Amino acid sequence: PALCEAACTCGDVTGSSVTVRENEHAIIETAYAKGWLHAAPPPSRTGKSIAVVGSGPSGLSVAEYLNKRGHAVTVFERADRVGGLLMYGIPNMKLDKSVIERRIKIMQAEGVEFRTNMDVGGAVAAEELLNGYDAVVLCCGAKKARDLNVPGRDANGVHFAVDYLTSVTRSLLDS
């Protein structure tokens, strides 16, 4: 259930809370199934170019809104797939990867360019972006997990959550 469902006051009257998550899911899935959602490129372009570093939730949001304003947007992602934490940090049982992939396809059709395997600050110099774009937006995720100084932390089989989820998801996507 969505976080608000536990505190929903409709339950006081009807006996159950409003199933917000399920309602929203049904609406969006119906819209996709019936073809109501389609690419809507901006009517005009500003001539400005923006580099977005990172394709996680914030990077995708920034890219979408800047593109809608008419800017040419290029998203740089260090991983081999777009989506950041959405793609690698959330298990498929919670967020099916096809949901992310279909949204990316719409964004591409609207004019957003995605470049994967592009490690900005590594193989791609930051100066290259600063010189090649009118603006650069940093939406990079935390690559290094925070370690805990607790007994057993270094035991066999103890992993950082995002590292573990990334490994499992990558193996599923590559199979």
Residue ranges and their predicted role:
Residues 138-139, 160:
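Redox-cofactor binding/interface segments in oxidoreductases and associated redox assembly factors
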Residues 51-76, 115-125, 130, 144-147, ...:
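Rossmann-like dinucleotide/flavin-binding elements
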Residues 3, 23, 86-134:
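N-terminal Rossmann-like dinucleotide/flavin-binding domain of flavoprotein oxidoreductases
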Residues 27-44, 105-119, 145-175:
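Glycine-rich dinucleotide-binding loop and its adjacent helix/turn
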Residues 2-30:
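Iron-sulfur (Fe-S) cluster-binding segments and ferredoxin-like electron-carrier domains
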Residues 1-3, 36-53, 58, 87-88, ...:
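Ferredoxin-like iron-sulfur electron-transfer modules
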Residues 71-87:
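Glycine-rich FAD pyrophosphate-binding loop
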Residues 46-48, 131, 154:
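Residue-level preference for short coil/turn positions at secondary-structure junctions
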